[in-house]
Amino acid sequence: MSRYRGPRLRIIRRLQNLPGLTNKLVESKKKKVSGSDQSIQKKVSQYGIRLEAKQRLRFNYGLTERQLLNYVRIARCAKGSTGQILLQLLEMRLDNILFRLGFVPTIPSARQLINHRHILVNNRIVDVPSFHCKPKDIITIEAPKTYQSILSKRLESFAKDQIPEHLTLSLSEPKKPKGFVNYLINRESIGLKINELLVVEYYSRKA
């Protein structure tokens, strides 16, 4: 399954707010279920809940189905909680790090900057959005002057308290902001409200 490129509002209306996909918000609506539909809903509810959690994770981080499945397989082979390791792998992607630092409004915007070779990690150009960032990595932007002015205005209005503790944003040089990876992210700093165990359960027969 390819990466979704359709209307983002349609997705968040179905899956609720996904900060990585879009900064637009929708109000949650609870559907009323009639008595005749309750028995049917009970049969599909567990699968439906797991599917929705999986879809929220996939669309928030902008992954294809195959990419997410591969991350689940990697997490299963690692020591520790599969769900937490899965979230850690996704959060430490370069495109997500740019988003969490406030360099871009969404993860798709970050992916565009990376693909255009405007992002440096430790002074080396990285053009792979899935690049796995590590502690002590330094991230900088080498973009056209037109974007630099947009970035400066964005960072001026971006609240630093939104940046998770495992990252640091330096504005000592306004025209050359830097992002620092302090350590691997912990569960409390994950930017998406998600029950990762539901995702692991969804893939239990596939991974």
Curated annotation (Swiss-Prot):
Q: Where in the cell? A: Plastid, Chloroplast
Can you name a GO cellular component term? chloroplast
Q: Which GO terms describe its biological process?
A: ribosomal small subunit biogenesis; translation
| Molecular function terms, GO-annotated | rRNA binding; structural constituent of ribosome
Keywords from UniProt, A to Z, are: Chloroplast, Plastid, Ribonucleoprotein, Ribosomal protein, RNA-binding, rRNA-binding
What interactions and quaternary structure are annotated? Answer: Part of the 30S ribosomal subunit. Contacts protein S5. The interaction surface between S4 and S5 is involved in control of translational fidelity.
Q: Which family does it belong to?
A: Belongs to the universal ribosomal protein uS4 family.
Q: Tell me the protein's name.
A: Small ribosomal subunit protein uS4c
